[in-house]
């Protein structure tokens, strides 16, 4: 059995093809050789390239089309604006319809879960089914839960409040309930402080006819669940995070939101102003929805999956837990089981 991959490059209603030739909207369409599927999935992320999404050949082998789709913000989350991303996703959905696809399944994987939910809530050409696969509830929520609240100077990666330092042995693990509550409140406070600064800085720059600027964000691998396995116990390796050992990752240059424009912060990361938060958008979803969560995920937790499931307005919604890691990369059997589960769910509704 041969799997075909077709490159798709298209302009967006809000952005034409670049002078060098690249299209703002790009991806790969995966199908079983010689077929024209009537049911297809589309998967998009805020900034990660999903053209070669791990699940694409598995779904294609089962007779579905799969469009791994990228917006203009692939690799450029520091410039993200939700309205433009929604327009770019719509280009992919319309292309699928033009190929004869009758049922479009929005696959929201990892950070893409809230993005696809926002698309479904706000776009004109909506999907017919929605799947949340090991998805974070929303972009502001995941950043806030991961950020290190012991940062006391956003311009200095070293400056630390020792009383809130999660890697200070005096704090834990194990972490006390009092420390956890104080820590979580301080994480929210950090997000709000950055939002206030971003709003004020944008006004200051605009007054000088400067439209925006980039700023760094330090230390975003500090969710206490990365360090203490007793907090929301699962089968995940702990201590650990997607970037390795949390104490080293948290001091390194790689992390979500590591650079951002002021407008991108307000559009994507802010707890106060972003429409990339899950619950408000999920509350507008009335199509059949499936929430799949793996039990050894190091960055998405059972409470996240339950929050997503509970927020979806549809009366046809299912929450399922499966063995495996975030991308089911730990086991071929886990990956096959996850794809079979989703494929069966789709077939039952098409």
Language-model features: where?
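Conserved alpha/beta-hydrolase "acid-adjacent" motif
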Residues: 51, 274, 298-304
